[in-house]
C-alpha cells in the first residue's frame, strides 16, 4: 500500500537523520548518511552508506567563569575533566562535563545548581577542522527580573523527623498538626499518636549532617537507607530555606 511505502520512507529518513546527528555529535561535522536499497529475490534490503569526512578537533579550551568560588572548585578537580585540547569535538563529552561539574557542586552545598547554568560557545577556525571552545557559567537568578548574583552555598541547619504520613501531605509546614514530639541526640522527632520506629533507627540511617554543607550524595544515601526499612512505605526528604545571619541554610524534614 502507498501509505506503507510512505511510512517506510519516513522511517528511513528519520534513521538517516539520527545517524547523521550522532556522527556530528562525535565531531564529524561534515558526515553524510545515505540510505541504499538493494532488491534481492524480491526482498528489499536496506543499508546505509556513511561518509564521515574529517573529524573536527578542539584547538583551544577557555573558561568564562566569573564566580570565583566555583572557579576554584573547578580548578581543584580539573584532573578529572573529560575535556582536553586536541580531542575530537564530541558533543556527548561536552555534555558529560557539564554533568560532572554539576554533580561536584551538588556535593559542595550548591543546592540550587543544575547543568543548565553551564553552556558552551564553539567557533570553527576558518579553512581548518579545528574548533575553539569556551565554557560559560551563567550567574544565579532567583527570578527573571532579579539582578544576577553568585551561586549560593547552603549549609544544613536542622534535621527534623516526621513519622506521620498525613503530615507530609500538607505542603505548608505551618499547617502541620502534631500532638507529640521528642528530642533524641539533638534531633526533633515529631509524631501523631504513636512512634513506629525507635529514634536510634532513625538517626542511625540518617546521612545528612547539621552544620555541614548540603551534599546531594548524602541525601541519596539517606533515601536508600530508609528505603530498606520494612516499617516505612516510602521516604520523603524536603528542604526549606532559612537565612541565619548572612549564611544560607536549609532545614530538612525527613519522612
Put a short name on every predicted segment.
Residues 230-233:
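Long hydrophobic segments that form regular secondary structure
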Residues 253-255:
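Extended beta-strand-rich architecture
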Amino acid at each position: 500500500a502507498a501509505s506503507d511505502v510512505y511510512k517506510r520512507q519516513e522511517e528511513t529518513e528519520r534513521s538517516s537523520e539520527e545517524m547523521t546527528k550522532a556522527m556530528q555529535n562525535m565531531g564529524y561535522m561534515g558526515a553524510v548518511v545515505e540510505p541504499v536499497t538493494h532488491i534481492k529475490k524480491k526482498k528489499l534490503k536496506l543499508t546505509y552508506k556513511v561518509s564521515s569526512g574529517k573529524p573536527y578537533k578542539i584547538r583551544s579550551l577557555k573558561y568564562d567563569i566569573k564566580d570565583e568560588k566555583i572557579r576554584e572548585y573547578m580548578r581543584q578537580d580539573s584532573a578529572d575533566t573529560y575535556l582536553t585540547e586536541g580531542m575530537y569535538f564530541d558533543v556527548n563529552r561536552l555534555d558529560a562535563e557539564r554533568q560532572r561539574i554539576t554533580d561536584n557542586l551538588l556535593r559542595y552545598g550548591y543546592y540550587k545548581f543544575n547543568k543548565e547554568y553551564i553552556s558552551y560557545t564553539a567557533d570553527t577556525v576558518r579553512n581548518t577542522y579545528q574548533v575553539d571552545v569556551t565554557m560559560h557559567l551563567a550567574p544565579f537568578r532567583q527570578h527573571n527580573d532579579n539582578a544576577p548574583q553568585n551561586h549560593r552555598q547552603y549549609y544544613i541547619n536542622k534535621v527534623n523527623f516526621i513519622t506521620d504520613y498525613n503530615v507530609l501531605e500538607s505542603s505548608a509546614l505551618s499547617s502541620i498538626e502534631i500532638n507529640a514530639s521528642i528530642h533524641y541526640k539533638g534531633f526533633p522527632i515529631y509524631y501523631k499518636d504513636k512512634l513506629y520506629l525507635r529514634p536510634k533507627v532513625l538517626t542511625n540511617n540518617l546521612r545528612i549532617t547539621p552544620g555541614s554543607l548540603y551534599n546531594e550524595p548524602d541525601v541519596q544515601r539517606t533515601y536508600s537507607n530508609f528505603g530498606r526499612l520494612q516499617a516505612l512505605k516510602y521516604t520523603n526528604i524536603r528542604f526549606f530555606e532559612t537565612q541565619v545571619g548572612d549564611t544560607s541554610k536549609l532545614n530538612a524534614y525527613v519522612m
